[in-house]
Amino acid sequence: MATFVLVHGSWHGAWCWHRVVPELEALGHRVLAPDLPGHGDDATAPAQLTLKAYAECVATVIRGATEPVVLVGHSFAGIVISQVAELVPERISRLVYLAAFLPANGQSLSRLATADRDNPVAYLALHQEWINTRLAWYRD
């Protein structure tokens, strides 16, 4: 059986996998679903939220696994798992992009998001001040 690492998208936490985890475990797989920094139960300050911090969080989880993992990223986490694959390629057996951003080499999230201005993600990328306000509210 395999070890799955499930990485949630923006404004979610490990909780969003609550229906997936038992299904994979029932098939005999091991499942790890971390909260990214600043999401779910993680109290990292918004000023410390970077792609590097997200990638290191996931890489740390993967380094604790006993075998190469199936790394699954949802939505924004497509960017994260791409970065993790650069950090620990030998620890990953497969990457799975689940309705996720799949950036071209050197492409940023803001460039991906703003490529389609009718997309709600593009709206959020263009309105960073709203995101910062939302993060403050989420922590209250």
Residue ranges and their predicted role:
Residues L71-G73, L98:
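Short beta-strand immediately N-terminal to the catalytic nucleophile in serine-hydrolase-like folds
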Residues R30-V70, E86-L87, S110-A115:
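Active-site loop/oxyanion-hole signature of alpha/beta-hydrolase fold enzymes
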Residues I131-D140:
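Helix-loop "lid/cap" segments that line or gate small-molecule binding pockets
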Residues E86-N132:
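Flexible "cap/lid" loop of the alpha/beta hydrolase fold
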Residues G73-A77, I81:
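Gly/Ala-rich beta-loop-alpha elbow adjacent to hydrolase catalytic centers
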Residues A2-A43, T66-V70:
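Conserved HGGG/HGGXW glycine-rich cap/lid loop of the alpha/beta-hydrolase fold
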Residues R19, Q83-L87:
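Active-site signature of alpha/beta-hydrolase-fold catalytic machinery across serine-
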